[in-house]
A protein has these predicted regions:
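Alpha-helical transmembrane segments in multi-pass membrane proteins
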Residues: 12-16, 20, 32-35, 39, ...
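C-terminal ends of transmembrane helices
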Residues: 1-5, 40-51, 140-149, 207-216
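A beta-strand-loop signature enriched in Asp, Gly, Thr, and Trp
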Residues: 167-220
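Cytosolic-side transmembrane-helix boundaries in multi-pass membrane proteins
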Residues: 239-283
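Structural signature of hydrophobic alpha-helical transmembrane segments
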Residues: 26-35, 121, 125-135, 188-202
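Small-residue-rich segments of transmembrane alpha-helices in multi-pass membrane proteins
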Residues: 14-25, 59-72, 162-171, 201, ...
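Long hydrophobic alpha-helical segments that form multi-pass transmembrane helix bundles
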Residues: 51-139
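Loop-to-transmembrane alpha-helix initiation sites
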Residues: 54, 58, 194-200, 223, ...
């Protein structure tokens, strides 16, 4: 802002509020500083600043941290609310605020059982980043964004539909016996298709990330395609990614790149339809 001689743009405030929700709470501040500088300069300013960037800045920061410091983002140093240790502590009569443990996606990926029930997953009494755990609060936020027209309901709905379709396909593969329990993919592929929406960050990504008005598709039909592919790819990456059992941020960044292409073909398709109608009327 000082270099360009104008006020600080409000778009950075949104990024500043979202980033703490998608990173571990004990990540060193110097790492976060480096990542934010990268996200702002490479993810936004290089393209011309607010309104011109093609990648979601918060996800650019998240991606930089994941690839530059993977052990802090998905390794033993990740601080989460635990599972087995929590139950043991409760059984011993201890009171815990939080401990280090494995996320639900990590447990499923390893073929382990999960001690949380569906209501724990819905209310947010589960391991995970701050923003992704409580599905109830995410839904409240989604209703607010839709009511104020700040977020597209088409993108939210289509993202969830895409995730459900991919989950159904994987369930069908397991039910058909094409994948056995010995497969390393069996754990996540056998998860009920609807449960994918209440574990991990698919719901958070659909509401707060995919709906970014700058980097998402602008046409109505394009929003349906854009959102569906995000959900579809998110579950696919979640199952097949051997290093990190979550694919939402990668899927959104990928579709950010293809959003202009989707809109281009949607617009061209509409132009061709109108030209045909015009020829029919003038014939």
């Amino acid at each position: 802002a000082i270099i360009k001689g104008h006020e600080v743009e409000e778009g950075y405030l949104v990024t500043g509020m979202i980033v703490p929700l998608i990173v571990p709470v004990d990540i060193p501040l110097w790492m976060l500083t480096v990542a934010v500088i990268f996200g702002v300069v490479i993810g936004k300013e290089v393209f011309g600043g607010t309104g011109m960037n093609i990648l979601n800045p918060a996800l650019t920061i998240r991606a930089f941290l994941f690839f530059a410091y993977p052990t802090w983002m998905s390794g033993d140093k990740v601080w989460v609310h635990g599972a087995v240790e929590r139950d043991q502590a409760i059984a011993a009569g201890q009171n815990l605020d939080a401990i280090s443990g494995e996320t639900i996606l990590g447990s499923y990926a390893q073929g382990n059982s999960v001690v949380y029930d569906y209501w724990d997953m819905f209310w947010g009494i589960i391991p995970g980043s701050v923003g992704e755990t409580s599905k109830f609060l995410i839904i409240i936020g989604a209703l607010f964004l839709i009511f104020t027209k700040m977020g597209s309901w088409r993108i939210i709905v289509s993202t969830l539909v895409g995730a459900l379709v991919m989950g159904l396909i994987f369930n069908g593969v397991v039910d058909a016996g094409w994948i056995g329990e010995s497969s390393k993919f069996y754990g996540l592929m056998s998860v009920p298709f609807w449960q994918h929406l209440i574990i991990g960050s698919i719901l958070f990504g659909a509401v707060y990330m995919a709906t970014d008005p700058v980097t998402a598709s602008q046409t109505n039909k394009g929003k349906w395609i854009y959102g569906f592919l995000i959900g579809f790819l998110s579950i696919m990456i979640r199952v097949f990614n051997p290093a990190y059992p979550e694919g939402v941020f990668l899927a959104i960044l990928l579709m950010n790149v293809f959003a202009p292409t989707i809109d281009h073909y949607v617009v061209q398709g509409n132009v061709k339809k109108r030209m045909k109608r015009l020829k029919v009327k003038t014939a």
